[in-house]
Every structure is written in structure tokens, then in C-alpha cells.
């Protein structure tokens, strides 16, 4: 064989020239597909322009189409971006939580210590997910697909072309078990469900393809195991439902991409959420029996545990949302009040930042704890309503306290408070508690368990009373009535109407649904029932049941088969009627008050007991005595609006400091408020008993007011303090400086002189999950000028000392006895609050560049030593460094 001659270093071989195409050929092969793609895009973009010109349409239609396309593309990109972000969170959960620890969008087990993380359950689900996917795929093809084809003749070609449930499995972000309920025969567990799936489901119907590529579902799923048994299988049934409507977002493909179009995407998602809510959101539930032969009626359709009556009274200091040319205007506020699937909307108060509604809404509550009261405030506009703040209240504490009358601070807004009165109404069977309707409020509820009907007439035009006999039927109607009716039921009590589901083509329909009504007058109101045919749009039977007919039956329950009027001779409907009366029950005596108004259950009855047994000492009084100081009318009016009717008995003992000196009587308007006793008269040490009355005590509850004591003006010598503070003291932002003003002190050491006192009421509100600090007022403050001082109070929850975490009261001008009555809330978990301290400083407001003294004193309170659930209200002595005097 002849050896091949070696080629020159720069020359290509003949074999390489045959196998490797030249650069011109490669360039042409790449440009050809790109050129074709470019031409197709140009034709696609210019096609609508040519079509508009051919049809003689104006350019407005082109702009409108371009706008709709851009909007659709924006929605599409946003949905894909949210899905990608959710996938990233699932893949890097630990890093995301570490980076966003201070954020609000975190799993429930981080925010709430009673929610446990169950990572072991997620590992089990992840391991078994491929097998579960195979099971679901077979169920879809073998059972779901034939059922869909049987629904209509137009769905006979319906086929699942692709079923892939992806690698992303559902997760349980947190589990909370409720063990403090009274029912010992049930286990209640709340699961924080999160499914961010990469599933791909495609369907085909008459060569039209559609499908889903990605689903997000988040919500709280409650699982109830009830009743617990002593033998196998130890559980009678499993009940599953969502406490609130879950959040659902679907990424559509194929023809269903049109559902992402502007104006349609929100409607499509809401329709799917409503479809889930009709089956799985309270009061709807799914009950799966575990033990055979068990009656599941009470489990599938339980009675409400109570009724909450919401008095939407007023709001104040709402944010200004109506702006015109940069000028701040007012708002047109209205409120949306909801519990689960029950929603109400108040009327709109136009151009008012302090609206008054005085409206009442009533809700049925099925699960406590679990369901929350949500209030959202909006500013009504012609284009889009602006958000003014929201509020979420746990109904468990309202059920415990029976009545809560409180001003609530709105969340997610700059300013605003909402005044609500919440009443928990118990369901009773005692007819003695039945009262007449007062002001349109409900006195009872009616629960209707609609079971089934039998022997409904096929021909709705052949009633015995001859109502439809005279009508002439067309040939189409005669042929149609030979089929069984598709019946549904309309039930109404008063102005409220409910409609059942439709049972297609069945003369013995089974509905198995429950409906609830509020009753205003049991003696006069009736239940109106009408069975209708969905195909013929006519009545198949009617029934009227007076509600007073239920009163003679045991447990106010009537269960029987009722004969339908205007129907066949043997047409019956089976249902159960349950009547319950509504009443606000009194709280048990001696039980601790845990509601939000507990912060303001201060001294209502004040008793003064002299401890000096001198000749001028007065004996202990049996009844309450009022202070000689005249109250402020405006503040009293405000306190009455915050009052509530239920309190607990408690007694607080405080020692009133003695006045060292008495000065000349001040002149001016504030002199009457500053002095409680005649000038020049010596005061003896006295013990102040602050008594909070029990639930049967009359009169409104007022906020704690500081005790008015005579001012003791004295001069301070020139002095500068810079005390060394350790531990938490070094974190306080108050730097005490007394060298800015020359005053005189008789007697020496500044540390031994009193700087005044401040009254605080501190308590952890479980209802709001926050620490509430009520600044009541101050007394005996140090004067900064000849006219007194302009004090205000600054509060920090150490160790947080950022400007955003700073709380500040309003400034009270020219007074040494300021009354604030301002509440601040710190949204911190209970376990975290125990590790914190309060830094409360009283300061003097001074103009910019002024040399007046700013610091008047401060107080440091270690919260780990206090009972925050019970709360405390007392006077604290102001010191330069916040520590109590030794």
C-alpha cells in the first residue's frame, strides 16, 4: 500500500475538505432558518395592520389590539416569574429564610411558636410522590375521563393527551394541633399546605388542545378525627376542609392561554377558587367514614358553634388618598367585613377621614379557634379603590370574652384606627331567652338539613289543582316532559334565599345540603320552599313551614317527610329543621379577662385610705370616692367610646408620693387641672386602691387616668449628667443632659431629687399577637421654662433602636401633668417579648436651635419579670438612667 503524502501545515487535507463544510455553507445554513423566522414574524405583526386597512378600520383598533396584547404578555410574564420564584424558594428554602428572616412572607412555624415544622412528613411525601403520581394518572384515565365523556354528547372526544404531575410535590409548611378544646372525643390539626407544582396536564377535545403547566395552591387545611373510639379503627371519620379560601394560581397552555388575557385572568382564577370553596371551604366540608355503620349526619353538617355580631361604629385618622395636582385631599371610605365565605360591605362615607357608619353585621361561626374576622377599609374611586388599612381578629378570644368594645389600630397603613363592638351570641334551646326583634337584629337562627325528595312529578303541567291544565303544550314540551326532571330547591326565610344544587334527570333526587338563616321573629316568619325543574323552568312542588311549629318539639328539632303542595299525591321531601335562640351569655365570675380591652381596664373605682393616724386622717370609705380634680370632658367622651361592658374584679395598690414642697398658686387655665388639694396644705402618705369592677358592675369602663397631684416647682443647679449604663441601659437612646439650662437646687445631689412619674399599662394581647403599651400620663415633671414644659413620650422595645421602631406620643404644651392616653403596639411573638425590655423616655419638645433641656427622665422595664398575659398598670419614677433609685 502506498503511503499518503503528508500535507503542508497550513493546507487542509482532502478528506477534511470533503467532510467539513466551508464557512460560507455554514453561514448560509444558519441564516436560512433565521430569515424564515424573521419573515414569519413580520407577516404576523403586519397581518393585523393589513387586515385593518382592508376592512377600513381606524388606527384606534390597532392601538387597542396592541394594548391588549401587551397587557396579556405582561400578565403572562408575571405569572411565569412568580412560578419561577416559588420554585427557587422550594429549592433553596434555608438560604431564602436566612436572607428574608426579617420579612413577613415566611412560613408559619417561624412566626408562631405553636406551629411546628414537620420536615419528616415532607420527606415521606417526597419519597412517595412518584408512586402517588402513577396512581393519580391511572385514576384520571380510568375514572375521570369516562365520567367527563358521559356529561354531554359534545365531550365524547375528550382525552387526556398528557398527564405528568412533575417532580415538585406538595409540602406541609407547619402543623398546629388544638388540644385546649372542650371536646375530648376529637383531634383537630391545622396543616399549612403549599403546592407549587411543575405538573403538565394536556387535554384534547375535537382537535382543540388545552392544558395546564404549573399550579400554585396555598391555604390552611383543617383535619378533624372524630369521634375517637375505644376499638378498631379508633377513629370514626375524617373531616377535611379549608378554613379560608385558598390562594390558587394556574399557568395555562394551549387554547386556555386566552384565560390570561386582560380582564379574564382574574375572573378565571376567582371562578376556580369559588369552585373549590363550594366543596372544601367552611361551612362546606368533606367527611370520609372510617368505621362502617356510623351516622355521619352531625359530622357532615354540624351546627354553628355561635354567632358573632359585629358593630361597625366609626374610624378616625384615616389616610388621605384622594390627591389632585399634588394636593392632599380626603377619602371616601367604606369597609369590607368578612368571615370565611361570608362577606358584607358597608356604605360609603364621602369626603371624610373620620367616618361614622353605625352598621351591624351578623356572621355564623363554625370553627373556633380557626376562623378570623377580617376587616378591610378602602377609598372608593371611579377607577380603582385605594387601600386604607386592614384588621384581623381571632374569634377565639371574642368567644371567651363575650363582648369586646375597642379601638383597633389598622395594619398596613400609615395611620388610622377602627372602632368595633363585637358580641358573641351563644346558641340556646331555652325558650325563656327568646326576645322580640329590636332594631332589625336577629333573635334566632334556623338550620335546614335538606336531605332528599321522592316521587317528583315528571309532568309539571298535570297538577291536581289544575293550575297548569289549561295551558296548551307544544310538541317539543310534550316530548321533553317524558324525561325525569332535573330538580333543585329554593329556600327562603324573610329576604334571604338559598338555592341547592341541581340533580339531573332524577325523580328521587338526593341533595344532602345544609342552609342557615337568621330569624328576626320566630312567631311570624315562615320557611318557604319551592322545588323547581331546571329543564322546564317551572315548579314541581311548594311548601311553607311556620317556624313556630318547631317550638313544641324536643331540642327544637323537627325531622320528618313533608308533603309537597301543588305536586303529586305521593311527592315528599325529607329534611330536618333546627332552631336555636341567640343570646349574649355572661362570662364566668373570676375568669381572667384576656380580651383587647383589658389594657384599658384601669381604675374605675378609686378609694383613698389614709395611712397617717393623725387628727386629720379620715377613715376608710366603704364606697368609691371621686377625685376632686375636674375631669377633661373631651377625654372622658373618648374613653366612653372605648369602654366595654364586661370586666373582671381586680385590685391594684399604688403608693402616692408625698409632695416635698408647695409653691405659689399658678395662674391660668391649667391651674385647676394641676392641683387636687388646697395650696399650702400638707399631704399625708396615702394608699390608692384601684378597683376594677366585675362583669355585673354598672357603668362604662374608662382608661386609667394618672392621679392629679400638686406640682412642686423647685430650681435645679447647673449640672451635667452622663451616667454609665451597662447591659440594656447602653442601648437606650436617651442621653441625659442637664447642662443646657441654669436652675437652682436646694439641697444638693441631683440623683436624690424627683424628676416626676409616668403611668404605664403594659400587656400582651393574644388577640392581636402584639405587646400593647398604653401611655396614660405623667405627673410632677421638671419645669424647663417659666411656663412649665412641652412633654412627650418616646418608647423603644429594646434591643431594637431603629428609627422605624420608634414610638412617639403627641406633644402636650405648657403642662407638667400631661395626659396622653395613647396606645402603641409592637408585633412581636410572646416568647420573644420575654427577652425584651421597654425603654420609655419623657422628653421636652424644643424648637430647632433652642438650648432648652430635652431629656426629662426615663424608665427601663424588664419584661421578663412581668406577667404580660395578665398585664400590669402602675406608676414609675423617672430617673436619669432609667434604673430605680437604690
UniProtKB/Swiss-Prot annotation:
Ca(2+) 3 binds at residues 381, 383, 385. It is a peripheral membrane protein; Multi-pass membrane protein. Gene3D superfamilies: C2 domain (2.60.40.150). Its main location: membrane. Residues 114-291 form the SMP-LTD domain. Ca(2+) 2 binds at residues 322, 332, 379-381. The chain crosses the membrane at residues 30-50, 51-71. InterPro entries: C2_dom, C2_domain_sf, C2C_KIAA1228, Ext_Synaptotagmin_C2A, Ext_Synaptotagmin_C2B, Extended_Synaptotagmin, SMP_LBD, Synaptotagmin_SMP. Residues 1-21, 613-673 are annotated as: Disordered. GO terms for molecular function: calcium ion binding; calcium-dependent phospholipid binding; phosphatidylcholine binding; phosphatidylethanolamine binding; phosphatidylinositol binding. SMART domains: C2 (SM00239). Residues 642-659 have a biased composition (Low complexity). Ca(2+) 1 binds at residues 321-322, 379, 381, 386. Residues 801-808 are annotated as: Required for phosphatidylinositol 4,5-bisphosphate-dependent location at the cell membrane. Residues 664-673 have a biased composition (Basic and acidic residues). GO terms for biological process: endoplasmic reticulum-plasma membrane tethering; lipid transport. The keyword Metal-binding applies. Residues 1-29, 72-886 are cytoplasmic. Belongs to the extended synaptotagmin family. Binds glycerophospholipids in a barrel-like domain and may play a role in cellular lipid transport. Tethers the endoplasmic reticulum to the cell membrane and promotes the formation of appositions between the endoplasmic reticulum and the cell membrane. This is Extended synaptotagmin-3. It comes from Homo sapiens (Human). The lineage of its organism: Eukaryota, Metazoa, Chordata, Craniata, Vertebrata.
Amino acid at each position: 500500500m502506498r503511503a499518503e503524502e503528508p500535507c503542508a501545515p497550513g493546507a487542509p487535507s482532502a478528506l477534511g475538505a470533503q467532510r467539513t463544510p466551508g464557512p460560507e455553507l455554514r453561514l448560509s445554513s444558519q441564516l436560512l432558518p433565521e430569515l424564515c423566522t424573521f419573515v414569519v414574524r413580520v407577516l404576523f405583526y403586519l397581518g393585523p395592520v393589513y387586515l385593518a386597512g382592508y376592512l377600513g378600520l381606524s388606527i384606534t383598533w390597532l392601538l387597542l389590539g396592541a394594548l391588549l396584547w401587551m397587557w396579556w404578555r405582561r400578565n403572562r410574564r408575571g405569572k411565569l416569574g412568580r412560578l419561577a420564584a416559588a420554585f427557587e424558594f422550594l429549592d433553596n428554602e434555608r438560604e431564602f429564610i436566612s436572607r428574608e428572616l426579617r420579612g413577613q412572607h415566611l412560613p408559619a412555624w417561624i412566626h408562631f411558636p405553636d406551629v411546628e415544622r414537620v420536615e419528616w412528613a415532607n420527606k415521606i411525601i417526597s419519597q412517595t410522590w412518584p408512586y402517588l403520581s402513577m396512581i393519580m394518572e391511572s385514576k384520571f384515565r380510568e375514572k375521570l375521563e369516562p365520567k367527563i365523556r358521559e356529561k354531554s354528547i359534545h365531550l365524547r372526544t375528550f382525552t387526556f393527551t398528557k398527564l405528568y404531575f412533575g417532580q415538585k410535590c406538595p409540602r406541609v409548611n407547619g402543623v398546629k394541633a388544638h388540644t385546649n378544646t372542650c371536646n375530648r372525643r376529637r383531634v383537630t390539626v391545622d396543616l399549612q399546605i403549599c403546592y407549587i407544582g411543575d405538573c403538565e396536564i394536556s387535554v384534547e377535545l375535537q382537535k382543540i388542545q388545552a392544558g395546564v403547566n404549573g399550579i400554585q395552591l396555598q391555604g390552611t387545611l383543617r383535619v378533624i378525627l372524630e369521634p375517637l373510639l375505644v376499638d378498631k379503627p379508633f377513629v370514626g371519620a375524617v373531616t377535611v376542609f379549608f378554613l379560608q379560601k385558598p390562594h390558587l394560581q394556574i399557568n395555562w397552555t394551549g387554547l386556555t392561554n386566552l384565560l390570561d388575557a386582560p380582564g379574564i385572568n382574574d375572573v378565571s382564577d376567582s371562578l376556580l377558587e369559588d369552585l373549590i370553596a363550594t366543596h372544601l371551604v367552611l361551612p362546606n366540608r368533606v367527611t370520609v367514614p372510617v368505621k362502617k355503620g356510623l351516622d355521619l349526619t352531625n359530622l357532615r353538617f354540624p351546627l354553628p358553634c355561635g354567632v358573632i355580631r359585629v358593630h361597625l361604629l366609626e374610624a378616625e385618622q384615616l389616610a388621605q388618598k384622594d390627591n389632585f395636582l399634588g394636593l392632599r385631599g380626603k377619602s371616601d371610605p367604606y369597609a369590607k367585613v368578612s368571615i370565611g365565605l361570608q362577606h358584607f360591605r358597608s356604605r360609603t362615607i364621602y369626603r371624610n377621614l373620620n367616618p361614622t357608619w353605625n352598621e351591624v353585621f351578623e356572621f355564623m361561626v363554625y370553627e373556633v379557634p380557626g376562623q378570623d374576622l377580617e376587616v378591610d377599609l378602602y377609598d372608593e374611586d371611579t377607577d380603582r379603590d385605594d387601600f386604607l388599612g386592614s384588621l384581623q381578629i381571632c374569634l377565639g378570644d371574642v368567644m371567651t370574652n363575650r363582648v369586646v368594645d375597642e379601638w383597633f389600630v389598622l395594619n398596613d397603613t400609615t395611620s388610622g384606627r377602627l372602632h368595633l363592638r363585637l358580641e358573641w351570641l351563644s346558641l340556646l334551646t331555652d325558650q325563656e331567652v327568646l326576645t322580640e326583634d329590636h332594631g332589625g337584629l336577629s333573635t334566632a337562627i334556623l338550620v335546614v338539613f335538606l336531605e332528599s325528595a321522592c316521587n317528583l312529578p315528571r309532568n309539571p303541567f298535570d297538577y291536581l289543582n289544575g293550575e297548569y291544565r289549561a295551558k296548551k303544550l307544544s310538541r317539543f314540551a310534550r316530548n321533553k316532559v317524558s324525561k325525569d326532571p332535573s330538580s333543585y330547591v329554593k329556600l327562603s326565610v324573610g329576604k334571604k334565599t338559598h338555592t341547592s344544587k341541581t340533580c339531573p334527570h332524577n325523580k328521587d333526587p338526593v341533595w344532602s345540603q345544609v342552609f342557615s338563616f337568621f330569624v328576626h321573629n320566630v312567631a311570624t316568619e315562615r320557611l318557604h320552599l319551592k322545588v323547581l325543574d331546571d329543564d322546564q323552568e317551572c315548579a314541581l312542588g311548594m311548601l311553607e313551614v311556620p317556624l313556630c311549629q318547631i317550638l313544641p318539639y324536643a331540642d327544637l328539632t323537627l325531622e320528618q317527610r313533608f308533603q309537597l303542595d301543588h305536586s303529586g299525591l305521593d311527592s315528599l321531601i325529607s329534611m330536618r329543621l333546627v332552631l336555636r335562640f341567640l343570646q349574649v351569655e355572661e362570662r364566668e365570675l373570676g375568669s381572667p379577662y384576656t380580651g383587647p380591652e383589658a389594657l384599658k381596664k384601669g381604675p374605675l373605682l378609686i378609694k383613698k385610705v389614709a395611712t397617717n393616724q393623725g387628727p386629720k386622717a379620715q377613715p376608710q370609705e366603704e364606697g368609691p370616692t371621686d377625685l376632686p380634680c375636674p375631669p377633661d370632658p373631651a377625654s372622658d367622651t373618648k374613653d366612653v367610646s372605648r369602654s366595654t361592658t364586661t370586666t373582671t374584679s381586680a385590685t391594684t395598690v399604688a403608693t402616692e408620693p408625698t409632695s416635698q414642697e408647695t409653691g405659689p398658686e399658678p395662674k391660668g387655665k391649667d391651674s385647676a387641672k394641676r392641683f387636687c388639694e388646697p395650696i399650702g396644705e400638707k399631704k399625708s402618705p396615702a394608699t390608692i386602691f384601684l378597683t376594677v369592677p366585675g362583669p355585673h358592675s354598672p357603668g362604662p369602663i374608662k382608661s386609667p387616668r394618672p392621679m392629679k397631684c400638686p406640682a412642686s416647682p423647685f430650681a435645679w443647679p447647673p449640672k451635667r449628667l452622663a451616667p454609665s449604663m451597662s447591659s440594656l441601659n447602653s442601648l437606650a437612646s436617651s442621653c441625659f443632659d442637664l447642662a443646657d439650662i441654669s436652675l437652682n437646687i436646694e439641697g444638693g445631689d441631683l440623683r436624690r431629687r424627683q424628676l416626676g412619674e409616668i403611668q404605664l399599662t403594659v400587656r400582651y394581647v393574644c388577640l392581636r399577637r402584639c405587646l400593647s403599651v398604653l401611655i396614660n400620663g405623667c405627673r410632677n415633671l421638671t419645669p424647663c421654662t417659666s411656663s412649665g414644659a412641652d412633654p412627650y413620650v418616646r418608647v423603644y422595645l429594646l434591643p431594637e433602636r431603629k428609627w422605624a421602631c420608634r414610638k412617639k406620643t403627641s406633644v402636650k404644651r405648657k403642662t407638667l401633668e400631661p395626659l396622653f392616653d395613647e396606645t402603641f403596639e409592637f408585633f412581636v411573638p410572646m416568647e420573644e417579648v420575654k427577652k425584651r425590655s421597654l425603654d420609655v423616655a419623657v422628653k421636652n419638645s424644643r424648637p430647632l436651635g433652642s438650648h432648652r433641656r430635652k431629656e426629662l427622665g426615663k424608665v427601663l422595664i424588664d419584661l421578663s419579670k412581668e406577667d404580660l398575659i395578665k398585664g400590669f398598670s402602675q406608676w414609675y419614677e423617672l430617673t436619669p438612667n432609667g434604673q430605680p433609685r437604690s
